[in-house]
Amino acid sequence: YSSRVIPYPSGRNDRQDLIIGGEAAMYRYRFLGFTPEGAPIYSDPAPVLQRNAPLYGGSLTVPNVVDWDGDGALDIVAGNSEGRLLFFKNRGTNTEPDFARSEEVCAGGSPILLRPGYHVVQGPFEASWGYLCPTVCDWNGDGLPDVVVSGSRAKFEVMLNRGTREKPELD
C-alpha cells in the first residue's frame, strides 16, 4: 500500500498543508510552523470530510447494529481492514436513521487499532492490516455493550465496558 502526499494551500500563509491518503480516509495535516532548527511542524491528522457523504468505514467493514450509547436509536459499530473499531452515531430514529461520521472507539483512553505486526501467517506485507471483526454483545451480563473481536492476529479478545450505558468505556 502506498500513499500519495499532496500539498494543499493552507490559506494562512505561503506554506502548504499536506493531504495524505489512508485506508479509512484522506487525512489533512495542517502546517503549524517550524522548530527552532527549521524542521516543519504539522498537526495531528484530521480526516478530510465531504458534505452529505455516504457512510464510509474503510475497506472490508464488518458492521454491528446496536444501541451503543443507550439513547434508544440503533447505531453502527464496525471494524475494518485497517484494524480500527468505529462508531457511527444515529442522530435520527430507527425508522429514519441519520448517521454521523465515524468516531474511533477507544479502550483505556486510546483509539482501538489492532494489527498483527510481522507475526502474521500471510507474511510481512500484511503486518499493518488488522481485519478487525467485532461482535457487540453483553458478555458479562451487566446490561452494558461489550465487544468481542477477532482479526488477523488469530485470537479472540473480549473488551469489557467499564463505563455507563450512555457512555461506553472499553478496557
Identify the function of each model-found stretch.
Residues 24-27, 83-84, 154-155:
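Loop/turn residues immediately N-terminal
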Residues 2, 15, 60, 73, ...:
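Active-site lining segments that contact anionic ligands and/or coordinate catalytic metals
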Residues 5, 18-20, 26, 76, ...:
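Hydrophobic beta-strand residues in large extracellular and virion-surface proteins
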Residues 12-21, 70-79, 141-150:
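Acidic/hydrophobic-patterned starts of short beta strands in beta-sheet-rich repeat architectures
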